[in-house]
Each structure stands twice: as C-alpha cells, then as structure tokens.
C-alpha cells in the first residue's frame, strides 16, 4: 500500500485530524511493516525504498505500507483556491520539484545532458498532443461500450 501524504485532506492540515505523527505508523495495528519516505519529492529515495519493499513482498512476506511526504501545489479541485496555504509555503515546496531535481541529478552525474532531457520532454509533449488529437477526432463511445472489458457484473 502506498500513502502519498500531501499534508492536506482537501483543505484541512492532516496533523490537525490524526492522533499520530504519520500514517505509516498505523501499519503495525494491522500486523504489517510500515515504511516512511521523508522526502517523497526525491525520486531516488522513493525508488530505493520501493526496490526494498517490492522485493520483501515478492519474497512472500506479505503486504507493507509505505508513506511518502510530498506536496500538492494546487488546490484539491478547480473550486479550491488554496487560501489555507501561504504563498511562501507553496513557493518553498516548488523548490523541491521532483522533476527539476531529477533532471539536475541526471545532468550533474553525467547520465544525460540538458539537450537530451529536452528531447525527451519534446517527444513526450508530442505524444500527448497526438493522443489528444486522436481522442478529439475519434467518435464518441457508445453507451454499451461502458460495459465492455469489465471484470464482474
């Protein structure tokens, strides 16, 4: 199980509604190990933790609960202006952008160059654009198709 803790339940700070410090601490009540990733915006920390727990599960040891602390930059929905957070709080978390941090890691460790990363980003944007064009030019699905490929009646 993976708990992505963005520190808010809609607009309520999580710390004000739970009686423990972190959700992963609940795991022991269910007899499963709980794991904590303090910086869920660090892709390598997340990868390394999941490499460990996936092997644990594949070895037949049962489930685990992993919690990662991260941040939701925008409101919970389009009707949520996010006024319960300060601009400073949001700006501080934006400095921890996982994509920008990982790009920096790749460049710093000479795994990829800035131009190689830009090429991957461009290819991804092009693929999304093509998918949108395909979706917009495709016929609307039929009502009957809503019931295709389901697992149970």
Language model features with spans:
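Glycine-rich ThDP/TPP pyrophosphate-binding loop and its adjacent helix/strand module
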Residues: 1-137
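C-terminal intrinsically disordered, low-complexity extensions immediately downstream
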Residues: 137-153
